[in-house]
Design a protein with these regions (language model features):
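Short helix-capping segments at alpha-helix termini
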Residues: 5-12, 58, 157-158
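Short conserved micro-motifs at the rims of enzyme active sites and ligand-binding pockets
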Residues: 29-30, 75-76, 149-151, 174-179
Length: 205
């Protein structure tokens, strides 16, 4: 649509897309008590949003989460204290690690039916950080019951050895965080990635 509009307007300078507000919001209603309490399911939705932004980085140049503290936010704050909601963790990982150039990805995995389409269980984006010499692969396994073992292939180079895995997960998809319990959080693991491929089992959510 943008390309068509630019052609009709005889405009040569590019027009990009900005998401001024995005987040998960489907429970709280009314003028008061609007604070959403997020669960692991919501964190998976946020990670999918972020994957979409990275995959379309050639046209999406800005995306702002709404809000940052309270109401619909990754941080929940009260008079007694504050804590990280589940959606904080994918946002933190993308902000900390997903830098550089967005890479094109090809995903071949099992699918599920939704709205007349077949949707892959693995939602994937990737980026290359030229300064750090690192490839960042972001994967969301949307299967509720099965871990998905996957070969990750590099077509134009080779992996250099140790890989760090940051996994956001919890006891079940309805798990929530609170001031006294972080049921959903990031766990760090190590993996080996040598040659042009490595294999990893992405856990169910």
């Amino acid at each position: 649509l943008i390309a068509e509009a630019m052609t009709k307007a005889e405009r040569k300078d590019p027009i990009y897309i900005a998401f001024d507000e995005y987040n998960v919001w489907y429970r709280a209603k009314g003028e008061e008590g609007n604070e959403e309490v997020y669960n692991l399911e919501d964190a998976l939705v946020v990670s999918t949003f972020l994957n979409i932004f990275v995959r379309n980085a050639h046209v999406v140049k800005m995306a702002n989460m709404a809000q940052l503290v309270n109401v619909i936010a990754p941080i929940f704050s009260t008079k007694e204290g504050s804590w990280y909601q589940t959606i904080f963790y994918p946002l933190q990982l993308f902000a900390t690690h997903c830098h550089g150039t967005s890479l094109d990805t090809f995903v071949d995995c099992d699918t599920y039916a939704l709205g007349g389409e077949r949707i892959p269980y693995l939602d994937v984006s990737a980026a290359y950080d030229n300064e750090a010499g690192e490839v960042i692969v972001n994967v969301t396994n949307r299967h509720r019951e099965q871990a998905i073992t996957t070969d990750i292939l590099c077509q134009t180079g080779r992996f250099g050895g140790k890989a760090t895995v940051y996994e956001v997960n919890g006891p079940d998809i309805k798990a929530e965080n609170s001031m006294t319990r972080q049921a959903v959080k990031t766990v760090t693991k190590e993996a080996q990635a040598r040659g042009d491929r490595f294999t990893y089992a992405f856990p169910a959510h």
